[in-house]
């Protein structure tokens, strides 16, 4: 055989192998990796208190792609909360995630290419629980005491704002960086004096092992926490149609979670995370479901994120300015609201916190 024929044969084999490899790759399912900046009791792969938690427990995304065998949904819940989600985005291991305001702003400041697609878990209250017989009755009593919070989370930023409003800073406290499970154990054993958090602390108080002495409920609404569904820019650009369907699924979950007639069923669904239903009931007491589960990127939400960005730098949590221009991407949300007939379902709020007339 001549050399030229050998070369042609080799080229043909290489071409065939290349086509085979490309076909095999094309036949591989698209795995949509979704992160959640929290985890359930005893590391259960569920959470509670947000429409994103509803989407997971109610399998809204799985149902959205049920007739697409080449699309798979994979959830990851992070004990390390928002900072761990940023690592997932940085390593291209996540396509979408539920994440709080501070860690998503930190990600933005450090150059992560993400987009804010819709709100989920916005306007969440924060609680201060204290150990039994600690003598702590109010925020000012925290001075010099051991106080737990999870650094780098939206609860961290909210706690600093609350302290500042009461004449304190982090430096006035002995701050202990603990996750939720560690906080509960330390507070129950009185290894710490107090802690900032939410349902885990409500549950601990219900058992008689701690006392709730403060909540942002009924206080300045800007002390609350915000969160949303964040998307990786490269995935969004490569798969706009898939992104639209992902947002559709989250909006459907938000709609169901906002219907007062579903309140009992909603708490039951969130109970998959291991949080007792009475605790969830207390967490949402006197709050309208539609207020807490709205997906809207309204003026109030945007203004709060801008304020958080400024405060984060002021408090030394972020070293540089955070450019939010172009980060909020309401296109997919607006399409969902139009397609699902939900344009007037949720009440938008202005930057002043007041309802905007429709």
Question: Model-predicted segments: where are they?
Answer:
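Pocket-lining segment of extracytoplasmic ligand-binding domains
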Residues: 176, 182-274
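Short, polar/charged alpha-helical segment
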Residues: 40-72, 110, 162, 307
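Flexible hinge/capping segments at coil-to-helix
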Residues: 131-146, 237-241
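A ligand-binding cleft/hinge motif common to bilobed small-molecule-binding domains
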Residues: 98-110, 160, 192-212, 304, ...
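Short, well-ordered beta-strand elements
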Residues: 28-52, 71-77, 144-148, 174-176
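Conserved C-terminal helix/tail region of periplasmic/extracytoplasmic solute-binding proteins
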Residues: 312-358
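Secondary-structure end/capping motifs
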Residues: 41-42, 238-322
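Short helix-initiation/N-cap motifs at beta->coil->alpha
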Residues: 75-87, 100, 168, 173-188
């Amino acid at each position: 055989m001549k050399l030229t024929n050998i070369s042609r044969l080799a080229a043909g084999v290489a071409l065939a192998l290349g086509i085979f490899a490309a076909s095999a790759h094309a036949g591989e399912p698209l795995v949509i990796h979704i992160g959640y900046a929290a985890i359930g009791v005893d590391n259960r792969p569920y959470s509670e208190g947000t429409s994103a938690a509803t989407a997971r427990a109610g399998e809204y995304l799985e149902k959205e792609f049920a007739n697409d065998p080449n699309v798979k949904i994979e959830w990851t819940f992070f004990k390390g909360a928002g900072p761990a989600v940023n690592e997932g985005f940085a390593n291209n291991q996540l396509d979408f995630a539920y994440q709080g305001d501070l860690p998503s702003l930190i990600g933005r400041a450090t150059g992560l290419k993400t987009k804010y697609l819709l709100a989920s878990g916005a306007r969440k209250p924060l609680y201060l629980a204290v150990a039994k017989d600690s003598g702590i009755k109010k925020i000012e009593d925290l001075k010099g005491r051991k106080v737990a919070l999870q650094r780098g989370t939206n609860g961290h930023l909210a706690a600093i704002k609350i302290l500042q409003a009461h004449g304190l800073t982090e430096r006035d406290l002995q701050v202990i960086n603990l996750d939720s499970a560690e906080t509960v154990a330390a507070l129950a054993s009185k290894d710490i004096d107090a802690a900032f958090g939410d349902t885990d602390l409500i549950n601990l108080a219900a058992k008689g092992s701690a006392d709730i002495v403060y909540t942002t409920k009924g206080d300045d609404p800007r002390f609350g926490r915000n969160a949303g569904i964040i998307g990786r820019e490269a995935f969004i650009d490569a798969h706009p149609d898939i992104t639209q369907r992902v947002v559709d699924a989250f909006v459907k979950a938000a709609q169901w979670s906002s219907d007062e007639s579903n309140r009992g069923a909603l708490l039951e669904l969130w109970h998959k995370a291991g949080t007792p239903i009475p605790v969830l009931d207390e967490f949402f007491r006197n709050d309208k479901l539609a207020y807490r589960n709205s997906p809207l990127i309204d003026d109030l939400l945007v203004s709060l994120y801008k304020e958080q960005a400024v405060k984060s730098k002021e408090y030394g949590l972020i070293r540089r300015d955070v450019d939010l221009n172009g980060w909020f991407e309401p296109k997919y949300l607006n399409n969902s609201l139009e397609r699902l007939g939900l344009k007037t379902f949720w009440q938008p709020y202005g930057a002043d916190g007041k309802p905007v007339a429709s």
